[in-house]
Amino acid sequence: MKALVKAKREEGIWMQHDVPVPEVGVHDVMIRVTKSAICGTDVHIYNWDEWSQKTVPVPMVVGHEYVGRVEKVGAEVEAFRPGERVSGEGHVTCGFCRNCRAGRRHLCRHTVGVGVNRPGSFAEYVVIPADNVYRIPDDIPDDIAAIFDPFGNATHTALSFDLVGEDVLVTGAGPIGVMAAAIARHVGARHVVVTDVNDYRLDLARRMGASRAVNVAKEDLRAVMSELGMREGFDVGLEMSGNGRAFRQLLEVMNHGGKVALLGIMAGPEPIDWSQVVFKGLQLKGVYGREMYETWYKMVAMLQSGLDLTAVVTHRFSIDDFQQGFDVMRSGRSGKVVLDWGAAR
């Protein structure tokens, strides 16, 4: 089959046409991929950075954001049938550790990542356990279904705390950050402010519904807060940037008793002023992946109740033009990039 493969321990990803079709175990589902999306993780793997070198075995079929149709099911699978439109949870869990057995599978210490530690979805076919397959309702378009993985990250982070009537700061205007901003507005936040230094992505945040999108290299965040009539500080902070300076600024402008969810991953150890956390009585929560499968139910429900993510998909290419997709993702001038397998030559 055709697939995008991390075939060498160097920068790049390569199209190969002779990749073996993955085998279907008795509890597995084979999915014929129709659309894939490029994740920031895929860019890290493309760049072959330090994390990728330590994490990804080579060769590896990459990719974990996709939508497709069931092609084949294992002998013990009864919940799905060929032809159904589905996506899949990208974290494959052990099912036996304490967290898995308690229903907290997103905290499994033995998690294996699709497209990172096992063959992924930048391929004509991907095989995952039936427990990881999620059926997509007919009223959700393919482009949005293909980005359920990062949409799930945004949902899990944004809904970590009650947002109704709250003032929310989102640090980082990447695709997950701007989706989190849209979610916050959808569920009833008062002011949603997004910060970054990338004007392209700040404009995307505005189109996704942010009250204000602030380039902190050019604007004073506290002045923006005053302009919005905020007298104390932000009630909820969503750290999506993985940037230490942005996180420190977030702590400075949080209200006493505020709550902070962190999804962004710092490149290394970062100093912070712990007195901001202690004396303000802040709550900090680390977020990983998606709650299985409460996050997925909430994603569908929000889309069906009017949440509009259309603007976050900014570029579309045939899978044969995947290099253009990676180039635009690496430029920083894009939202989500979707690759169409149906348009392949």
From Swiss-Prot:
Record's subcellular location: Cytoplasm
UniProt-annotated binding residues for NAD(+): I176, D196, R201, L263, G264, I265, V287, Y288
Cellular-component GO terms for this entry: cytoplasm
Active-site residues annotated for this sequence: T41, H44
Swiss-Prot/TrEMBL keywords: Cytoplasm, Metal-binding, NAD, Oxidoreductase, Zinc
Pfam families to which the protein is assigned, alphabetical: ADH_N, ADH_zinc_N
Named cofactor requirement(s): Zn(2+)
Enzyme class: oxidoreductase
Pathway: Amino-acid degradation; L-threonine degradation via oxydo-reductase pathway; glycine from L-threonine: step 1/2
Chain residues that bind Zn(2+) 1: C39, H64, E65
Recorded GO MF terms: L-threonine 3-dehydrogenase activity; zinc ion binding
InterPro entries per the UniProt record, alphabetical: ADH-like_C, ADH-like_N, ADH_Zn_CS, GroES-like_sf, L-Threonine_3-DHase, NAD(P)-bd_dom_sf, PKS_ER, Zn_alcohol_dh
Cofactor note text: Binds 2 Zn(2+) ions per subunit.
Reaction equation(s) it catalyzes: L-threonine + NAD(+) = (2S)-2-amino-3-oxobutanoate + NADH + H(+)
Site feature Important for catalytic activity for the proton relay mechanism but does not participate directly in the coordination of zinc atom, where: D149
The enzyme's E.C. designation: 1.1.1.103
Quaternary structure and interacting proteins, as annotated: Homotetramer.
The family this protein is said to belong to: Belongs to the zinc-containing alcohol dehydrogenase family.
Stated name of the protein: L-threonine 3-dehydrogenase
Organism: Anaeromyxobacter dehalogenans (strain 2CP-1 / ATCC BAA-258)
Protein's gene: tdh
